[in-house]
C-alpha cells in the first residue's frame, strides 16, 4: 500500500466560500480546507481538496467517488447534531464500520472515525481550532501509522513546562488550549481570556506550536504553574 499516494480532504457546508470569493451575509471562508490540507502536505501526504454542499445525496456520491481514488478521507463540518449535519447518516448509508464516535475533550468532541471498504474516514468539527487540534491528536498519528511511518501511539511529544500566562476558566472536561512553547516555558495567547480560545477562533492560533492539556476538573491556571504540553511535530 502506497499510503501517501493521494489523501482527499472534503469540507462540507453550503455556507463556505473559497478564498477570493466575495463575502456575503451568512457566508464564511473555508479556513479549514486551507489550514488542514497544508498541514497534511507538510507531513508528507498528497492532498486534494474538495467542497460539497449540504445535500445528503451529493455527499454520498462524492464520498463514493473519493473512496475509489484515495487511501483516506478527512472531512470538516457536518458531523455534530445540527439540522444539516448529515455525515453520520451518510456514513451509515455507505455501510461504514464505526471506529469511534465522539471524543471526551474540548474542543473537537463531535469528531468521529470510521472505515468504508477498509479505508479510513475521519470527520472533524467545522470549527477551525477544533479541527486543527483533533487533526494533530488523532488523524495524523493514524495516517502516519497506516503509512508505516509510526510504530504506535501519539506523535505529539509530552513535556512539563511552566506557564508564563494563565487561563481564567475552569475545565469540566479535558481541555486543550493552543499555546506557544519556548525553552522550559509555555504561553497561552490572549492573556488568560477564555473568549480568545473559542473553537472557532483563528487569530489566537497564530504562532502556536503546541497544545496545553488541562485535565477534567481543573480550575483556572495561573502564571508559574506547571502544565502538560503536547508539542506539534514538523
Predicted features along the sequence, with ranges:
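Short beta-strand segments
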Residues: 9-12, 75-76, 104, 123-125
Amino acid at each position: 500500500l502506497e499510503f501517501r499516494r493521494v489523501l482527499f480532504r472534503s469540507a462540507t457546508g453550503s455556507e463556505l466560500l473559497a478564498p477570493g470569493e466575495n463575502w456575503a451575509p451568512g457566508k464564511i471562508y473555508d479556513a479549514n480546507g486551507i489550514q488542514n490540507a497544508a498541514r497534511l502536505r507538510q507531513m508528507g501526504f498528497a492532498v486534494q481538496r474538495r467542497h460539497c454542499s449540504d445535500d445528503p445525496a451529493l455527499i454520498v456520491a462524492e464520498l463514493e467517488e473519493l473512496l475509489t481514488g484515495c487511501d483516506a478521507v478527512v472531512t470538516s463540518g457536518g458531523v455534530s447534531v445540527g439540522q444539516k449535519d448529515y455525515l453520520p447518516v451518510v456514513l451509515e448509508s455507505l455501510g461504514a464500520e464505526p471506529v469511534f464516535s465522539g471524543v471526551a475533550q474540548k474542543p473537537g468532541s463531535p469528531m468521529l472515525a470510521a472505515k468504508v471498504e477498509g479505508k479510513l474516514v475521519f470527520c472533524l468539527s467545522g470549527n477551525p481550532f477544533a479541527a486543527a487540534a483533533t487533526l494533530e491528536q488523532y488523524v495524523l498519528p493514524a495516517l502516519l501509522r497506516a503509512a508505516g511511518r509510526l510504530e504506535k501511539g501519539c506523535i505529539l511529544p509530552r513535556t512539563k513546562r511552566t506557564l508564563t500566562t494563565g487561563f481564567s476558566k475552569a475545565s469540566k472536561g479535558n481541555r486543550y488550549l493552543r499555546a506557544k512553547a519556548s525553552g522550559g516555558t509555555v504561553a497561552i495567547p490572549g492573556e488568560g481570556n477564555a473568549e480568545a480560545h473559542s473553537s472557532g477562533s483563528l487569530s489566537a492560533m497564530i504562532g502556536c506550536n503546541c497544545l496545553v492539556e488541562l485535565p477534567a476538573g481543573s480550575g483556572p491556571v495561573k502564571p508559574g504553574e506547571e502544565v502538560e504540553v503536547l508539542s506539534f511535530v514538523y
